[in-house]
């Protein structure tokens, strides 16, 4: 099976995509670059700007149009921050937020087995734990990104990060 990842946004997203690539590789998937045929397409979205949301939807629409039998996944900050809107995006077979990244592979395997569309966006909770996502290597970067903290406790009126990433939690 072949899987293609498309990552928008920050280095945290790059780190999390690296962890997802490792999980899929360990399950026997081959990681392919954008533009190649794949059985699964995963977009790790950014929602800091509306442009990121649009780009995520556009990329998944194209993936579904060019590979109608493929499983498409919308994950990351966009569905986490705007779950109702993301859940309505029918081009995504799996819609999930920033929590429980380890469940993505299991849900993709269910979809490949014929399971109906899955929307799994859990809201962030107070006391939520830091999710350890080990990354052994980065395919497309010469430097590794190490995630030491996630979230934000400030509630700036103009910023979506606390909504997308939840409360601050760290490795320590």
Q: Model-derived features: where do they sit?
A:
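Proteins enriched for Cys/Gly/acidic motifs involved in redox and nucleic-acid/cofactor modification
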Residues: 1-172
């Amino acid at each position: 099976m072949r899987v293609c990842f498309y990552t928008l946004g920050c280095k945290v997203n790059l780190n999390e995509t690296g962890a997802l690539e490792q999980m899929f590789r360990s399950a026997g998937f081959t990681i392919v670059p954008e533009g190649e045929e794949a059985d699964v397409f995963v977009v790790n979205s950014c929602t800091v700007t509306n442009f990121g949301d649009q780009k995520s939807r556009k990329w998944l629409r194209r993936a579904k149009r060019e590979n109608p039998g493929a499983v498409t996944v919308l994950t990351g900050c966009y569905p986490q921050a705007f779950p109702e809107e993301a859940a309505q995006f029918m081009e995504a077979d799996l819609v999930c937020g920033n929590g429980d990244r380890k469940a993505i592979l299991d849900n993709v395997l269910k979809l490949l087995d014929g399971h109906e569309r899955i929307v799994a966006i859990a809201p962030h909770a107070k006391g939520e734990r830091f999710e350890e996502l080990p990354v052994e290597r980065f395919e497309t970067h010469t430097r590794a990104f190490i995630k030491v903290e996630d979230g934000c406790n400030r509630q700036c009126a103009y910023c979506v990060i606390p909504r997308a990433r939840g409360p601050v939690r760290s490795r320590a």
